[in-house]
Amino acid sequence: MRILPIVALSLATYGGAALAAPFDTCPSKAYLFQSNPVQVYGLNLVTGQSTLIQSDTGMDVNINGVGFDFENRYIYGYDTTNKQIVRLGHDFQAEIVNTANLPTGHTFYVGDVHDQYYYLYRTGKGLFRIDLRPLESDPTAILLVEQISSSASPKLTDFAFHPGDGSLYGIDNNSGGLYRFNTSTGAETYIGDTGELGTFGAGYFDVNGYYYVSRNQDGQVYRIDLSDDAQIAAGNVPAVKFADGPSSSQNDGARCANAPVIDEDSTIDFGDAPDSYQTTLASNGPRHQIDGMTWLGNSVPDGEQDGFVSPLSDNTSGSNDEDGIGFVTALETGFDSIIIANASISGYLSAWIDWNQDGDFDDENEKVFSDKELTAGTNQLLLNVDINALNGNTWARFRFSQQTGLNYNGGSTSGEVEDYQINVLNDGATARHFPSEFGYATLAYEDNWPYTADYDMNDVVMFYHITEIVKENKVVKSTIKGRFAAYGADYKNGFAVRLAGLSRSEIDTARTFQQHNGAINEDSGLELDANEAIFIISNDLTSKFSTNCSYYRTINSCKDSEAFAFNLSITLKEDADVSSLMGMPYDPFIFASPGTYHGQGLPNHPGRSYEIHLADQAPTEKFDTDNLAGLGVDVSDESSGVYFKTATNLPWALLITDEWEWPTERTDLVTAYPSFAEYAQSGGSKNTDWFESSNAIQNKYYQP
């Protein structure tokens, strides 16, 4: 180390001005210095909540490279505007610190305080330090700046001292590598890869040896476990997402590293599942800043120092605040369960259930709700119990917040977390799917029946999926899902599904529901004036989208996103006769919207009596056979089982077992997909891959 000769002085004249008083204690908050002129925020590292503490430090400057002096309880920083050292007390008013030999050819953005020495770092310039002890007896003392090294390779934007071993750590923004610095020589030692990149403008330690870094670009707070010497020696130092804080292009932080991160009068809510589910703070368990507005149940949650690990419970400490979620019906594999969520205010609910009872929420399908929007009061939700869930007791976690994108762990700036032990019943049910477990088929309709008209087969396009639950070789439940893909019609049409061969009386109406865009409808859509089991999805599909285009998703030069999805969950009575139930995909069809015109040569306002089905599928009991049979080019013949086809086998509805790209508006199906003609004429024996986009004419089909 070398001491530079005195060549530059930075002096402040205090006169009769009162000096800033130090902090009263070693505060648990982290302090975030942002913007120019600088503003100081209090950052709760546990939840990510930030609060503006001081918008005016008394100096119209940017302050960076800040660090907290534990012995004298001041924050020291570097004024990048005037290239001078400042300090702030408990009122966050900045005052100039007199120095000698402070470099003037560059600024500093990296700094921290340890053992009453203020350390500064600049990539390519070196490591510097300032002895702060003379200020104890003379606040106007001139402090000498010492240059420890002249080389500094890692690209840092902050570093911090470990309160346990006194080592100095920082992350290279370019590589994500964690380095330890020798404060006597300035030499750096590579520890390991944190796995994260970015401008980590603020770094802090807590008393337990956890290193927290805040990334400027997105405000995300990461935590690195440096509490274990063996882990450090092994280079096992991953940065784990811990909370969401404020983002800023100019960011620096200071904190009293000897303080715990949670105050004794905590206003943070934790969970209480076993710690294998990541419940405690050490495990990065879920925790919410209690904001006084956002909670589940009837009462504001009480604050905890940490997560309670089962058999201890949040309900045995403070108030009984685990009362926001109610399981109305049993959790039976393959079936839907009704959940009641009581919310204090509108917000977002996410939830996880450990279906395979392996002690975590990491597995596929274990996130059961994702940013489900709740309104104030009682919310009824449908939860589909995983078909492969194990029988017996397991755990569920519910998180309610004003934030979206929460995981089962990590911090939140608002809301509450509630953990529940639940019981799942698995009595041997199995599932079968159409067209596959996760795939969707395509239904495409031409609504000009019994005429072919433009035959663009895009008047109604619906993506379609079915899951049947089977017990003892008997269908007991069916879930039909759909995504509205396109509407190229001039007429108004509805959409429905018939479970042919099944009587309406076989439906368990108390356990049958229909959801539109995730919200439960008031009724299931079951037609009460029909003998068959027919479900109306919509009487008018034009009410399910809005567009500035001439048509919805049929013109490549004018595109929209999907706007409507439905989920129809049908449960059958225990003694239901399903011996005549048709197989999947059942009978999906379109019909004329009631009270609307549907073309020449048809009865005025035919409504439900006008239907279009897949080829060779008989219409429902509501079809007006007397007035509609024999019209146009349709050659339906009940005696031979022919329905909804022309003499050349052209149908008015298509079922394709994949997500298909339909013809553009006014483009004949055969023009877009030439191979379809021979497919139809052969009765489906030739050109069976006609619908693949590789067999289509470019620019003749819609490309989402």
Question: How does the language model describe each region?
Answer:
Residues 219, 224, 232-263:
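Blade-level signature of beta-propeller repeat domains, shared across WD40, Kelch, NHL, RCC1
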Residues 45-48, 88-92, 131-136, 182-186, ...:
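Short loop/turn segments that connect beta-strands within beta-propeller blades
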Residues 260-456:
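A broad "non-catalytic interaction surface" signal
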Residues 21-52:
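An edge-strand/N-cap motif at the start of beta-rich repeat modules
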Residues 532-704:
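A eukaryote-biased signal for long
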Residues 25-34, 74-77, 117-121, 167-170, ...:
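Conserved beta-propeller blade signature
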Residues 49-57, 92-101, 138-150, 187-194, ...:
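A short beta-strand motif characteristic of beta-propeller blades
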